[in-house]
Amino acid sequence: MLSLYEKIKIRLIILFLLAALSFIGLFFIINYQLVSERAVKRADSRFELIQKNVGYFFKDIERSALTLKDSLYLLKNTEEIQRAVILKMEMMPFLDSVGLVLDDNKYYLFSRRANDKIVVYHQEQVNGPLVDESGRVIFADFNPSKRPWSMASDDSNNSWNPAYNCFDRPGKKCISFTLHINGKDHDLLAVDKIHVDLNWRYLNEYLDHISANDEVLFLKQGHEIIAKNQLAREKLIIYNSEGNYNIIDSVDTEYIEKTSAVPNNALFEIYFYYPGGNLLNASDKLFYLPFAFIIIVLLVVYLMTTRVFRRQFSEMTDLV
């Protein structure tokens, strides 16, 4: 038969376990809500920063087009114009290509290749063949005014253009910013129109740079995703019937979704997915300190109580 001390000890163990389990359950219920709320707040904060950074990127492209225009002031000779554009492109790795419509309506295209070499295509007659530097025909009967970067933009306003098929890069999409030469600039430049195309690799790397390793970030134009960060490139992204995207991975991560247009550029949309609250997230470790402290206190109280009872029963046994 169990002694009175052992019976009391068993009851103390049961009470301790019940208290510990009740506390653990209550802690996880409360902390789960806190973690979820903190995740939403962090997602809002991160998305606000992402929006600003993406907006800065597109503004930089626009400023680059203006800088390119400034470098062409008073240049009338086509060789001087070519040298000026190539020099600027070497300083602007985020540009894939630059196109110029000269004041005589002839077209020049400066295209960056995989080895970072910039090749030049040009027209020797208006709407005629586009040829390379050796005179080889690249595109017959090329009409710049029929290209998407020209048709989608107004004759007076500078604008971004929807993604279109690059004629010099089969299977790839181009996104262009078109700069129109108007007013007094028209008298100082031998150019009527400039378009600059984004470098896709550079844009993807930029999204990598501004996002964290556990965040999914991509840009959309129309129904097409035009750029992704590293995690977005690794995951399966499925467009659903509700007009949103499902992020599929092997661990079924829950994400907080945030979307908006690029600041001051409604043509492009930002899709941002922040990982939902995780009770085991290292960023929440401070909330586990009170939990660990109370468990330790309960354990100490239990050990002290059993020790006191053991001593009392020992003294009673000695008296008997």
Which role does the model predict for each range below?
Residues 123-195:
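Extracytoplasmic/periplasmic ligand-binding sensor regions of membrane-associated signaling proteins
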Residues 29-63, 75:
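Juxtamembrane membrane-water interface segments immediately C-terminal to a transmembrane helix
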